[in-house]
Amino acid sequence: MSDNAIHIDIMIEAGNWPDEASLESLVSKSVAAAWNNLGLKSATSELSVVFTDDASIQLLNGEWRGKDKPTNVLSFPAFPVKAGSQPGPMLGDIVIARETVEREAKEEGKPIENHLSHLVVHGFLHLLGYDHETDEEAEVMEAREREILHALAIPDPYAVSDEDINND
């Protein structure tokens, strides 16, 4: 993201999150890796990332997606963007829930920082028009996530371990 200026607003709304500077560093690195991977042109853009808890994200998930349960990440694009096209100056909002992120990282045996980076990348790709409603869309989006996370030295979040195979 060498010539880009993405202004990232970090808001800790609720939950037991690390300090804002640590979160800002993680988000900035994740977003820069995604921007570079996508080969987007230089731009000045704005992004908001809200760090909250399960109760707050459950309300949003119910209101916007009709699902009355917490989730790990929600994305709210400022404007519709077609995957692969240049975004406008306002990207949108990403909301992440602490308890769900923590639980998933523990269940999947991965560092919470790696899982959090993955969710930032996942949410950012949604803001840029990527989705996973169909198998084809999911393949494209997950391939992008793998490439971006690899650039951050984070292992493939979708890899199936031998232990997973043996427990089925």
UniProtKB/Swiss-Prot annotation:
GO cellular component: cytoplasm
Biological processes per GO annotation: rRNA processing
Transmembrane segments: none
Keywords: Cytoplasm, Endonuclease, Hydrolase, Metal-binding, Nuclease, Ribosome biogenesis, rRNA processing, Zinc
Location, primary (coarse class): cytoplasm
Signal peptide stretch: none
Domain of life of the organism encoding this protein: Bacteria
Note on cofactor: Binds 1 zinc ion.
The EC number(s) this enzyme carries: 3.1.-.-
Catalytic class of the enzyme: hydrolase
The protein's required cofactors: Zn(2+)
Gene3D superfamilies documented for this protein: Metalloproteases ('zincins'), catalytic domain (3.40.390.30)
Annotated localization: Cytoplasm
Cross-referenced SUPFAM superfamilies: Metalloproteases ('zincins'), catalytic domain
Binding-site list for Zn(2+): 122, 126, 132
Family: Belongs to the endoribonuclease YbeY family.
Function: Single strand-specific metallo-endoribonuclease involved in late-stage 70S ribosome quality control and in maturation of the 3' terminus of the 16S rRNA.
This protein's name: Endoribonuclease YbeY
Organism: Brucella canis (strain ATCC 23365 / NCTC 10854 / RM-666)
Lineage, uppermost ranks: Bacteria, Pseudomonadati, Pseudomonadota, Alphaproteobacteria, Hyphomicrobiales
